Every structure is written in C-alpha cells, then in structure tokens.
Amino acid sequence: MKKAFLVFLSVVLVTTVFLVKQQESVAQAKQLEYSGEEIFKGFVFAQGEVGKQLPEVFNKAMTDKLNTKQAKAFANQVVADIKKEDADFFDNLKKAVYSKDALKVDELLKKAGQIVEEKVEAAKEIAASKDDTSRVQAELVNTVDTANYFYYVSYVAAAGALILIILAIDITPIAISDNVDREMAIRTLVDELN
C-alpha cells in the first residue's frame, strides 16, 4: 500500500512540475512582443521573425526577393520615412495588432501604403531612366528626399536587382487592392502574433 501511494505521489508530482513548466513557457512566448517596426517589416517586406511567421501571406520566392541586402536597405528607409511623417505610427501599429483591432491595422497600413507607393514610384522612375550607374547616382545625389533612400544603387551593377525588389513590393499585402485578400492577410498577421 505504501509503495502504491509513493508511486501515485511521484506521478502527481512529475505531472504537476511538467504542467507548471509548460505554462511558464507559454507565458514566456506570449510575453515576446515585436516592435511596430518589426511587425511592419515582417508584414510588408516579409523580413525578420514576423515575416517567417506568415507563410500564408508570402511564398518562398517572394520572401527571398524581399530579404536581399538591397531590399532590407529599402525597407529600413521606408521605416525611417514613415517615422518622419508620423512618429507614433509604429507604436499605434503595435497596439492595434496586439489588441486584435484588424480595422485599425488596416487603416494604419493604408496610410503607410501611400508612403510606400510614393517611394516605389520614385524607384521605378529612377530604374526606368537608368542608362548607366554613374548618371543615376548623380541624379540621386541631386534629389534631396531620395538621395539617402536609394544609396544602395551604387552597389547594383544593373537596374535588374532594383526592379526585382520593386516588383516584389508591388505584390505585398500593403499593395493588395483586393479587399478580401487584404483582410485575410491582416487577419493572419493579427492571429499569428496573438
């Protein structure tokens, strides 16, 4: 009888320890919150840990195109431009995502989408007029707002790499015009991060 009681007590103790440890790891995982910038880069540019959590939104080929050195520089500059226009944007995005407010997330992403579209259009114009790298670099130096934005052009031997980045950005969730697909992508983001 004593032996059975000790076995029972051991099983209960091991089970309790296991459940407590499991709850602690779940709590730690929930405590991991991404910054607004990380959420934005992950959702719009498939970059970072957030981008890896959204395979329903980005296919592998698009993820690869959006994770090049040039694409990351482009994303960093877009983030800087958004901060310049709205210093609270990324804090508001983070709050909206973690409060599961898909409508607010959509509203914020539409606002950011306008900034991204302006930058993509500027990049398209530069890429289209690119006869040689040195001429484009000279144009960029003379363009006050975009001089730093397109600094990576000096590392690109041809316009091809820049065009690939632009084409990849054109089909990211921020550029989706179909409301159903856009809502599904936003819902996926909110669900994956909560």
UniProtKB/Swiss-Prot annotation:
<dbReference type="GO" id="GO:0016020">
    <property type="term" value="C:membrane"/>
</dbReference>
<feature type="transmembrane region" description="Helical">
    <location>
        <begin position="149"/>
        <end position="171"/>
    </location>
</feature>
<keyword id="KW-0812">Transmembrane</keyword>
<protein>
    <recommendedName>
        <fullName>Uncharacterized protein YitM</fullName>
    </recommendedName>
</protein>
<keyword id="KW-0175">Coiled coil</keyword>
<feature type="signal peptide">
    <location>
        <begin position="1"/>
        <end position="29"/>
    </location>
</feature>
<dbReference type="InterPro" id="IPR023888">
    <property type="entry name" value="SdpC-like"/>
</dbReference>
<keyword id="KW-0732">Signal</keyword>
<feature type="coiled-coil region">
    <location>
        <begin position="104"/>
        <end position="131"/>
    </location>
</feature>
<keyword id="KW-0472">Membrane</keyword>
<keyword id="KW-1133">Transmembrane helix</keyword>
